Regions:
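C-terminal active-site "lid" helix and adjoining low-complexity regulatory extension at the edge
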Residues: 200-211, 228, 240-243, 251-280
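Extended active-site and interfacial segments that coordinate phosphate-rich ligands
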Residues: 5, 172-195, 252-254, 261-270
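Glycine-rich phosphate-binding loop of ATP-grasp-fold ATP-dependent ligases
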Residues: 108-135, 156-159, 181-200
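A long amphipathic alpha-helix within ATP-dependent nucleotide-binding catalytic cores
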Residues: 184-241
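Well-ordered, non-membrane alpha-helical segments in soluble/globular domains
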Residues: 3-14, 76-80, 129-134, 204-218
């Protein structure tokens, strides 16, 4: 069976993950690929827009997830699905409640429930601007609520990378990355042992980290297994007080997964910086 895999963006990243036997192209170029037998389509991440693009480009409906599967994934991608793992975070569906939340924490982050990679985020200190309130009202109307989180003084970002299949959710490894104002910048190519040591060195209570991992594992088994198949990355951060928090879950390929695989293939790159441009 031949295996066709393509990336919505960044075909070289997918080529690294899936090897030379895979054809990695942008979505708009799918129609240029010769299809000589059964194939699989694996984008950077699934959503209804990607599926429609593929159908227009000639992909077989049988090679794509069903509309029901896309709908289930969209529900998982709503930030409320992971609130039980996020201390202090709340789903707020009314402006007065948003004012109450800001009164409690003073420095907060607002996030649109269907957003990721630093998009759909607003930073607020002490009072809302008119633009903040307009944005929040619009998000609540369109996405049911807005997610509010206390703003932490972040000293370290890292992620745990997984692949979900039919029977289980497998842990692939850790990734260590840098952000600026919540937006990804680059990964450091460190092995899992080095990243674990770095995590522990920043924590004031390792038992709380162990407990959070146990809660995450239960959540993956109860909420993800059987509902989603594919890669996913769980982002964490540690604040200046040495406490660890879960930031978000990305149901797609991630740069952390790519960096982890790159280091596996190029162990001599240990300790260097990795970003999409690293692949040329």
């Amino acid at each position: 069976m031949s295996a066709l895999r393509f990336a919505q963006e960044g075909a070289p990243l997918m080529q690294l993950l899936y090897g030379k036997d895979a054809v990695a192209v942008a979505a708009s170029e799918f129609h240029t690929v010769p299809l000589d037998g059964p194939y699989r389509v694996i984008p950077w991440g699934w959503d209804a827009v990607v599926k429609q693009q593929l159908l227009k480009q000639g992909a077989a409906d049988s090679a794509l997830p069903s509309d029901a599967e896309i709908g289930t994934l969209r529900n998982l991608q709503h930030r409320t699905s992971v609130l039980s793992l996020q201390d202090g975070a709340e789903a707020i569906d009314a402006i007065p409640a948003l004012h109450d939340y800001l009164g409690r924490y003073h420095r907060i982050v607002l996030k649109a429930p269907w957003s990721g990679s630093g998009r759909g985020v607003r930073w607020v200190t002490d009072c809302f601007s008119q633009q903040d309130l307009y944005w929040a009202e619009k998000v609540i109307k369109e996405q049911r609520c807005v997610i509010a989180e206390p703003r932490r003084n972040v000293v370290m970002d890292f992620a745990m990378e997984y692949v979900a299949n039919v029977s289980d959710v497998q842990f692939v490894g850790y990734s260590f990355f840098k952000t600026q104002s919540g937006v990804y910048r680059y990964n450091m190519l460190w092995n899992d042992d080095r990243i674990q040591q770095e995590i522990v060195s920043h924590l004031t209570d390792v038992s709380l980290w162990n407990a959070l991992q146990e809660r995450l594992n239960r959540w993956l088994q109860q909420q993800v297994l059987g509902k989603y198949q594919g890669p996913l990355g769980v982002d964490f951060f540690i604040d200046a007080d040495g406490k660890v928090y879960l930031g978000e879950v990305n149901f797609r390929h991630t740069m952390g997964l790519v960096a982890h695989e790159y280091l596996r293939q190029h162990p001599a790159a240990e300790g260097t910086v990795f970003s999409p441009s690293s692949l040329g």
